[in-house]
From Swiss-Prot:
It is found in: Cytoplasm; Nucleus; Chromosome, Telomere. It comes from Chaetomium globosum (strain ATCC 6205 / CBS 148.51 / DSM 1962 / NBRC 6347 / NRRL 1970) (Soil fungus). The keyword ATP-binding applies. This protein is considered an atypical serine/threonine kinase, because it lacks the conventional structural elements necessary for the substrate recognition as well as a lysine residue that in all other serine/threonine kinases participates in the catalytic event. BUD32 has protein kinase activity in vitro, but in the context of the EKC/KEOPS complex, the catalytic subunit KAE1 switches the activity of BUD32 from kinase into ATPase. Disulfide bonds: none annotated. Residues 20-267 form the Protein kinase domain. Belongs to the protein kinase superfamily. BUD32 family. Keywords: Activator, ATP-binding, Chromosome, Cytoplasm, Hydrolase, Kinase, Nucleotide-binding, Nucleus, Phosphoprotein, Serine/threonine-protein kinase, Telomere, Transcription, Transcription regulation, Transferase, tRNA processing. This is EKC/KEOPS complex subunit BUD32. Component of the EKC/KEOPS complex composed of at least BUD32, CGI121, GON7, KAE1 and PCC1; the whole complex dimerizes. It holds the Pfam family Pkinase. GO terms for molecular function: ATP binding; hydrolase activity; protein serine kinase activity; protein serine/threonine kinase activity.
Length: 267
């Protein structure tokens, strides 16, 4: 199947040059592919996001949409990176060719880290018992809340906040030489939280948009980590302490929750 896909949608030309490190396909979705390769030198890993042409769309329209979406994502990432939000740095891009090269984030998804941490705890009930404030999982929730607070403070909403779109990068990791950090074993909830996959991100100062961002994460968290659902309140507290306009966002969040419950009741 992969070979057939490669024949139909070959990698972008930038990955076929003789000096390029052979790329590794990491993920493939309806809208694009993510490859792991290198940037400038063979010991500097990077991620290359590629949006191949869509045969079902008119070529001119497809080219315009691809260019607009990649350019928008790059602008959002650059804005976040300048403001100190933990996101991948953009190294290079060619919107006309449909690709963007970014910093490779070493580590594991937050989703994996939380589930591994929960897997080490006995399942005595539907939820984990109350945990102490200083436990690693609580500290992780605080770091996630702070990262989202920094994102919203910058005037950006992610659009698809889930624990799969967050990485735990080992502290002390050097992206230039690939030197390992202090952590990184699977299942650890230690490390720096890095937000990834900004394909649906927009620039917005709206409390409503920010509240929807949080609601999407809250629903995804409850679905993916039901035993740790009560810890989401810790995330919101950290968000509030990081972002001074959070109070009005959290009020809007209550409205969004109410609308969500009504939709659930109506089917």
């Amino acid at each position: 199947m992969a070979a057939a896909d490669d024949a139909q949608f070959p990698p972008p030309k930038v990955l076929t040059y003789p000096a390029s490190t052979p790329p590794t396909l990491i993920t493939q979705g309806a809208e694009g592919r993510l490859y792991k390769t290198t940037h400038l030198t063979r010991d500097r890993p990077c991620a290359l996001k590629y949006r191949p042409p869509k045969p079902y769309r008119h070529p001119v329209l497809d080219a315009r949409l691809t260019k607009a979406r990649l350019s928008s994502e790059a602008k959002v990432l650059e804005r976040c990176w300048r403001e100190g939000v933990p996101v991948p740095a953009v190294y290079a891009m060619d919107p006309a060719a449909g690709w963007m090269m970014m910093e490779w984030i070493e580590g594991i998804p937050v989703r994996v880290g939380i589930n591994e941490w929960l897997g080490d705890r006995p399942e005595e009930g539907a939820e984990i018992p109350q945990v102490a404030d200083e436990t690693p999982i609580v500290d992780l929730m605080k770091r996630i809340g702070a990262a989202i607070g920094a994102l919203h403070k910058t005037g950006v909403v992610h659009g698809d906040l889930t624990t799969s779109n967050m990485m735990l990068r080992p502290r002390g990791f050097n992206p230039v030489d690939g030197a390992p950090g202090d952590e990184g074993k699977a299942g650890s909830v230690e490390g720096d939280v890095v937000l990834i996959d900004f394909g649906l991100a927009t620039q917005s100062m709206s409390d409503e948009d920010r509240a929807v961002d949080l609601y999407v994460l809250e629903r995804a968290f409850a679905s993916t980590h039901p035993r740790a659902e009560r810890l989401f309140a810790t995330l919101l507290e950290s968000y509030k302490s990081t972002f001074k306009k959070a109070s009005s966002v959290l009020i809007k969040l209550e409205d969004v929750r109410m609308r969500g419950r009504k939709r659930s009741m109506l089917g």
